[in-house]
Amino acid sequence: GVKKEGATIGIRLSHAGAQTSESACGEQPVGPSVLNFGRDFDISREFDQGDVEEIVLNFVHAAERAEEVGMDFVEINGTEQQLLDQCCCIKLNNRDDEYGTAKIENRVQLALDVVNSIKKRESVKIPLSYYFSIFDKIDDGFKPKDLKKMLTLLENAGVDIFHPLAIHAMNKCFENKEPLCHWSAKYTDKPMIINGNIKSPQLLEEAATLGCADWFAMDQSIFDRLQWYQFLKRKIDK
């Protein structure tokens, strides 16, 4: 399978938060606030402390299962407007408690709870990655200092790997100065996964010149070509 081809494989763990419906999950969706993502989704209720405990425990159990089936690492989804991303977004989170307000340390608190609990579980020994993006938050005032604070908090909680999301790996942010992966590498020494429309040796080499990637993630790119990784490796080794 994947490992025989020389690749590393991990599994991403997500909680949809308000971006689901009662028919899909069996109960009213929960989110950081009362939200409605559209006609295909139900209006969420604001999560309470009991919900937090259940959410965290579900992430821990999912990480345990990832370890059991032989994953090389497990990744927490903090982007794609899933629950942890909803908490981080000012437009979607209007709480005034420890999981809200304008402070980034409050908006990332649920993610910290998840990471802390997974790292404390002795049955989970594989590395923990955190998947995040900030492009949709910049217009709402998300600054480099917020990125630095967020990464520092997550690193202190136990994140082993960071995985910044960009539509294209080379897309620049914060006044169009540098790609997100480059900004992230300024604020953490943890290994970095880069992805974002990397579908050719040329694009991979361009991304590699940034000098901040330890791994390059391939997802949809490999579906059409099962030998895609070996093809790419041969091209680069030439």
Across the structure, where does each feature detected by a protein language model lie?
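Flavin-dependent oxidoreductase catalytic cores
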Residues: 1-238
